[in-house]
Amino acid sequence: MGTAVLEVRHGSPQRLVRDLHDFDVLILPGWKNSGPEHWQTHWESAFPHMRRVLQADWDAPRYADWATRLTAAVAGCRSPVLLVAHSLGTALVTRWAQEADTRAIAGAFLVAATDIDRFEGKDGNTYQGFAPLILKPLPFPAWVIASRNDERVDFERARAFANAWGARCVDAGLLGHMGSASRLGVWPQGLVWFGQFIAALGGQDTRA
């Protein structure tokens, strides 16, 4: 399934992701990885310029290990890099960005930024080395996509995170944690926002 198919099938605006060929896109899932019904998996299948950063242990995440994999993935890219992160993947990005060489990073698209300081340890999850959440300006452009009924972060907290990171906060409405349970499929609206984000990187008008 290519970009053109997605545009026709879902009637998405013309700016969807037509400039994606200028970038390497790294997909960063959260705790337990993104399954077959997750929008990240759909995107990875649909676009050849997107690839997932695979972690050795998805169930007991260790920041040092995840950061090492991310650094290696970025080093292997030939084009400017876009990071597409979900949930714990957003905490990986914000911490990694403060210590890594980020010159290759063109921007980050951060979906469902988990409030790890409040939720670490719940449901049996442990995030070794990810907390506390880093609330410093990111050295690259970023958008935060936040849901108003995300069980892992209050909307106002997500908006405060975006402000601390120097990122734009996009109100996604009532989509829960925006994972597999939200049943977003290929998530056409998410692709629209991602396309607008890419357009904004080039200083273009991002209105559909």
Describe every region a protein language model picked out:
Residues 151-157:
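Conserved alpha/beta-hydrolase "acid-adjacent" motif
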Residues 138, 144-146, 150:
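Short beta-strand/loop motif that positions the catalytic acidic residue
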Residues 49-51, 163-179:
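Catalytic histidine neighborhood in serine/cysteine hydrolases
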Residues 19-79, 203:
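Active-site catalytic motif of lipid deacylating hydrolases and related acyltransferases
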Residues 84-93:
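Gly/Ala-rich beta-loop-alpha elbow adjacent to hydrolase catalytic centers
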Residues 30, 55-58, 109-118:
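Active-site nucleophile loop of the alpha/beta-hydrolase fold
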Residues 95-106:
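Conserved hydrolase catalytic core segment
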Residues 180-194:
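Post-His helix in hydrolase/transferase enzymes
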